[in-house]
């Protein structure tokens, strides 16, 4: 089903233990969402046997998240890009800035009124792009864009995989209302499915 909206753009800071496993901080509003474009790059290998493709393996390599937002405040700019805020409240960007990865959440409204929810487990953002334009005869909004690289997380799930994204659609059979209602209170942790009954 088609999506017709985008909102509730959040981020959660990441801290890593000695092994590099992530612990997520409390989610906070990143900005008002205008657009979100997610593209994924895959590693692919094809095994040829008997004059044809016998096996194909495709695995997540990395991705790119491009966010169009209404504004980026000083605290958010600092958290995402590594810029510093000086004693006068001025955001100072340096040549060696490189923010730490964060988790990112948002939701997309579907045409049936339900929402599809997302968590991207590890995104490292660059410096926000700024577009400026003088005021002419008509008003034209100029808004920032921020682009980040999506990576798999270091911490493994119950299958010893390294997840990079969690996604759920509201109203889908088997989806608990508790999962939806708590989506923005903490970064979603994959839950081990019950073994199939025989």
Annotate the PLM regions.
Residues 34, 104-106, 167:
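Intrinsic disorder/low-complexity segments
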Residues 25-31, 117-123, 160-169:
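Short amphipathic beta-strand/extended segments with alternating polar/hydrophobic composition
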Residues 1-77, 125-143:
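Solvent-exposed edge beta-strands and adjacent loop segments
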Residues 128-198:
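Mixed-charge, glycine-accented linear interaction segment located at domain edges/termini
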Residues 14, 70-74, 109-111, 123-128, ...:
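Generic structural motif
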Residues 3, 8-9, 18, 22-23, 46, 50, 115-119, ...:
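Intrinsically disordered, low-complexity segments enriched in small/polar residues
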Residues 55-121:
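Structured, beta-strand-rich domain cores
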């Amino acid at each position: 089903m088609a999506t017709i909206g985008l909102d509730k753009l959040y981020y959660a800071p990441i801290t890593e233990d000695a092994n590099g496993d992530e612990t997520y901080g409390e989610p906070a509003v990143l900005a008002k969402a205008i657009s979100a474009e997610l593209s994924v790059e895959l590693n692919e290998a094809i095994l040829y046997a008997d004059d044809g493709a016998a096996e194909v393996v495709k695995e997540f390599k990395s991705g790119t998240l491009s966010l169009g937002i209404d504004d980026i405040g000083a605290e958010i700019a600092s958290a995402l890009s590594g810029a510093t805020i000086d004693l006068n409240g001025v955001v100072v960007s340096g040549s060696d800035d490189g923010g730490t990865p964060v988790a990112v959440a948002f939701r997309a409204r579907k045409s049936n009124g339900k929402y599809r929810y997302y968590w991207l487990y590890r995104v490292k953002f660059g410096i926000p792009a700024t577009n400026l334009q003088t005021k002419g005869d008509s008003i034209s909004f100029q808004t920032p864009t921020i682009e980040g690289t999506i990576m798999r997380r270091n911490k493994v799930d119950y299958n010893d995989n390294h997840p990079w994204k969690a996604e759920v659609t509201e109203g889908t059979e088997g989806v608990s209302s508790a999962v939806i209602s708590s989506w923005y209170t903490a970064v979603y942790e994959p839950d081990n499915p019950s073994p199939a009954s025989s």
